[in-house]
Amino acid sequence: MSESPLTIVIVDEDPVFRLGLITVLGRETGVQVLGEGETLDDLRQQLETLAPSILLIDPQFPRRSQSAWPLLRQLSSAYPQVKICLLTASLEYDQLLAAKTQGIAAYFPKGTAIADLVTGLKQVHFGQTCWPSLQTVNAPPLSLWEKLIWPLFRDGLGQIEQSLQQVQKSLQVPSLSDFDRLFWRGRERELKFAQWLVRNLLPQRLKTWHKATNILTATTTVLPPSPPSPRRSGVRTITLRPPSNLTALGQILQQMPLQVENLTAIPLELDILQPLKRQELLSLGQQQLETTINELKALRITPAQLPENCLSIVAEMWRSLSLTFFGKYCQPKSEFSLEQIQSLLEVYQPIICREKLVKIPFVVPLFHHLLFGEPLVVNQKAYPLGSTEAQQYSDLYAQNLVIQLANSTMVFILNYFADHEAIKLALYEYSMLSSRQVARFRNDLAWYYQFSRYWLNPKQIFESQHTLLYLTPAGIVTTQVYAPRQQELTQLRAVPWFVTIVLECRDALSPRVRSVIEFVGNGLVFLLTQVVGRAIGLVGKGIIQGIGNTWQESRSQQKRSN
């Protein structure tokens, strides 16, 4: 029997109940209340810093969220050394079944006598479980027929639910056409009707099992990150990568499906990668951005130093990301060493800076905002740190930076190792393994580079816009953001400059040409309908009258002959 003290952390949204419970438990011998809280931040901080033996929590916490049951499942896996006990109002059978199935150590209804509560907590502390309402949980076992049909219903409902999620993600795509949206809406109605029909065909006891399964497999609640604090050994964090200021990118990467699609009309270097490798490269890019921000904070770089060193910082981010990704997946140990890869990166760095990295917009404002807390200026409006608009635009800029860094990493691989067999097998999609497909992919990229250089980029400079890539749960999409680009416009020469002149001439002439075409078109319509049309009508009328007269004369002759 363990002689370690019984330590408890209490989490409940009712402060009066929490205070009374702490006071009563504090009088008990061998029981120590280490902490208490009412928010997700409090819960995470208490578990990481105090490492209690028991977490006493209300499963209805937090009441403003959809469900705390997935949170309990996550806590159980992230902190296996902490035993979770429920202290709440009476639960339904399916909720009790879910709690017992996922390994909750004890359940105490609110109103349980303090002596019984302390006794149950001590039993849990010594490795036992405590279910005062156990007789209500143990329902009669399923019959043979129910055991046979239950997997069919469960798997069918699971497939319907997965299909519904895919349809809903498809409906979230901004560029979806009206016809496609109508199609997916119909598909959604069909799936919901099938789901309702299957659920109504379930026997009553299997409905209870299904509800319990839904509780166990609901979407996991992600605990928000807390400030760094001393932690005891053996305690693990709940979130895989606390994304600090870049919350949206981290959340999307965690929620993103494996089949991340390029939903833009732009060919991206990432398109050649396998879905898992594509997602991994984006995740590494996010981590590299976070690492760079932390390093710059540690170096205490000043706002005056940042603009002149920004390109070097981004280049170092690209170099580190490329080396990490290549070393993790692409290094054929028999042919290349990391030293050789580093030398190739150093040679290629000026080229990638000139062709790709220097063109990434809003990097300096993003770093100023994240490092020094300066307001983010968008459309001549300054949004302070912490505001909703500043968070949205900083997330957008960060996502575009990460995606462009990932694309630049693939540019390096495609230029030096495009046809290397080991690298193709490790990274490329199966449909892109042949040399012909790789050559076609590279040619498509090369054509787009030239098209962008001589048409798209001058056009966007003239229109004072930047095209940014960002992530959605369905995939990668684009958006247009306004920004003054007068200095770039004055620096255009040769073909790009001529493109702006063509656009300006088109803007100047098109309204006049349109009006002339409209006038001529109206004249032609009048001529064809009022003149030619009437003339043709008169001719047709004469022909019909002639046919009628001839027919009448023939009838008259027939009557006379008769």
Curated annotation (Swiss-Prot):
<dbReference type="Pfam" id="PF00072">
    <property type="entry name" value="Response_reg"/>
</dbReference>
<dbReference type="InterPro" id="IPR022552">
    <property type="entry name" value="UPF_Ycf55"/>
</dbReference>
<dbReference type="InterPro" id="IPR001789">
    <property type="entry name" value="Sig_transdc_resp-reg_receiver"/>
</dbReference>
<dbReference type="Pfam" id="PF12452">
    <property type="entry name" value="DUF3685"/>
</dbReference>
<feature type="domain" description="Response regulatory">
    <location>
        <begin position="7"/>
        <end position="125"/>
    </location>
</feature>
<dbReference type="InterPro" id="IPR011006">
    <property type="entry name" value="CheY-like_superfamily"/>
</dbReference>
<dbReference type="InterPro" id="IPR016837">
    <property type="entry name" value="Uncharacterised_Ycf55_cyanobac"/>
</dbReference>
<protein>
    <recommendedName>
        <fullName>Ycf55-like protein</fullName>
    </recommendedName>
</protein>
<dbReference type="GO" id="GO:0000160">
    <property type="term" value="P:phosphorelay signal transduction system"/>
</dbReference>
<dbReference type="InterPro" id="IPR051015">
    <property type="entry name" value="RcsB_transcriptional_reg"/>
</dbReference>
<comment type="similarity">
    <text>Belongs to the ycf55 family.</text>
</comment>
